[in-house]
Amino acid sequence: MSKPSSFHKDHLQQTRRQFVASGKHLLGGAALASLGLPNSALASNDGAVQPHFVPKAKRVIYLHMVGGPSQMDLFDHKPQMDEWYDKDLPESIRKGQRLTTMTSGQARFPIAPSKYKFSAAGECGMMMNTELLPNLAKKADEICWMRSLHTEAINHEPAITAMQTGNQVTGRPCLGSWASYGLGAMNENLPAFVVLVAIPKNREQEQAISSRLWSAGYLPGRHSGVSFRSSNDPILFINNPPGVPNAIRGRSIEGINALNRINYQAIGDPETQTRIQQYEMAFRMQASVPELTDLSSESKQTFDLYGEDAKKPGSFANSALMARRLAERGVRFVQVYHNNWDHHANVSGRMPDQCRDVDRPCYALLEDLKERGMLDDTLVIWGGEFGRTIYSQGGLTKDNYGRDHHPRCFSMWMAGGGAKGGTIYGETDDFSYNIVKDPLHIRDFHATVLHLLGFDHERLNYKHQGLDQRLTGVETAHVVEELLA
């Protein structure tokens, strides 16, 4: 008969006296939390690295447009393409670059000029799609426009993963987790990192959005994002079961955490500490989350600003308003995903829906943050995982077309939080196919965001598998000074 493992021995040898002694300080902490009183141990940043220099941004709201928005239909104006309608993309432009399997077999690569009206917005003269984004255009001088981002990934899963974690391979911490790890929490009653998944009105071709995109990877698990659902309970199982009062729930958590503390002393697994913190956070969120999600305190003026959709849980407008409320309550990093930007076909039928979803809420979010004095230290980011091709995928008419994936150039924008408003950075060729001025790799983008949060991207690291791991990886990355206010 085999002998019990040391793990089992540790548990068999625990006595009631040890249990009580080991857990007594946790009982006090949970009791304080149940009474709504602060607990200095719980309020601490618990090992946060702290900034290397004074940050310009205290928090981030990252609006990720899943699928890859078409840059030449939104922010990268190419009027000369009108003369190229239905002509083949020159090989001198393509330069043998990799294509997806969805278009690599096409006999032709016919140019599809954008059908939308562009005009200059703001004093900065940003040429953008004012037909579909009239409200966002009003903020042109407060926005830092980036038209020369590029990446290596040509398919959604690796591209989204790279955009969020700095690497196409899954299992790395995402940007929100690095922000949580570096800066810690500002509110003991809410997570440092929250994720909202908005539901688009048009759902023709949505991409999978999985929880690994807000994983902490090899960082301690407490830095993972907490996803809020758009209907019913925002977080599953956070409320007490029917018939179970707070006092009993609190005692249950006290007992569980005392056992976890004993386990930690015996085994030393740091994730046990994470589990303790998660139980405590969940208990405190029973009070904080209902208040957060109750929009009855918002004024008529606020709903007039964001639009009626802001009252509909799960809409992008509602998510934008929730992002402001989360930021206002001290959440460090709010990640909002908006799906269905993967326009392989029917751009004219889908792009207007997408822009109607985001145009007014994006304007409203920037205006709302500004009115509340929060925009200067809140960095707002908008963009996807790659761009689209100037040539049409599938059928082409002057009124409709599709576009394939294009990682060689795409557009994004930032506002607030130390980003330089009115800047137009980067330039692509006449076909929006290659970058001709100021290339901006996603590593440089990540380094710049970390800089705005107060971190040297080379010094913000975490020891894992014997290496000092970091968001920007081992390849060279630069902070782009031209993007900084």
Where are these regions (language model features)?
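Ligand-binding pockets and gating/stacking loops
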Residues: M1-A485
